[in-house]
Design a protein with these regions (language model features):
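Non-heme di-metal
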Residues: 1-142, 147-152
Length: 154
């Protein structure tokens, strides 16, 4: 089936997004000290590379990642924590899924790809354990206790 230029461009955008996310996850995995979290991020990266290869079957093009996006999410993840960075990145991907409807007629297996990607990545992201988040939760609870004590003293 011959793809229109508009559909082909959308597929190239999807493909570029997958290879960019692959590099983001790989970069984060290398920078994380916890072996279990690094392993999970490596697994997500390999999934993204597989999705890139799936899109490449239709576009027949090798694409380079968006280096600016890699650095942006890497820095966000280093400053605010990798869990925050990953969830921010994945929230952007949810809006891209609306565009999948426009190419559904050309790519019959797209529904399976979306389902697999959502289930697998969400399961893996939920497994991530970040010490910084646990610490932040303790700080919030401590501040809450202090506020209760302060209002009780008044």
């Amino acid at each position: 089936m011959e793809l229109s230029e508009e559909v082909r461009q959308q597929l190239l955008d999807f493909q570029k997004n997958e290879i960019t996310e692959y590099h983001i996850y790989k970069k984060l995995a290398k920078s994380i000290k916890e072996a279990e979290n690094a392993k999970i991020l490596d697994q997500i990266a390999e999934d993204e590379l597989g999705h890139y290869e799936d899109w490449k079957k239709y576009t027949n093009e090798e694409l380079k990642p968006n280096k600016w996006t890699i650095w942006k999410y890497y820095l966000i993840s280093r400053v605010f924590g990798f869990t925050f960075g990953i969830k921010l990145m994945e929230s952007g991907e949810k809006s891209a899924q609306v565009n999948y409807d426009q190419v559904r007629e050309y790519i019959p297996e797209i529904d399976n790809w979306i389902k697999d990607e959502n289930e697998h990545e969400n399961a893996l992201i939920e497994m991530l354990d970040e010490e910084r988040l646990q610490y932040a939760g303790s700080v919030v609870l401590g501040l809450n206790d202090a506020l209760v004590e302060l209002t009780g003293a008044l």
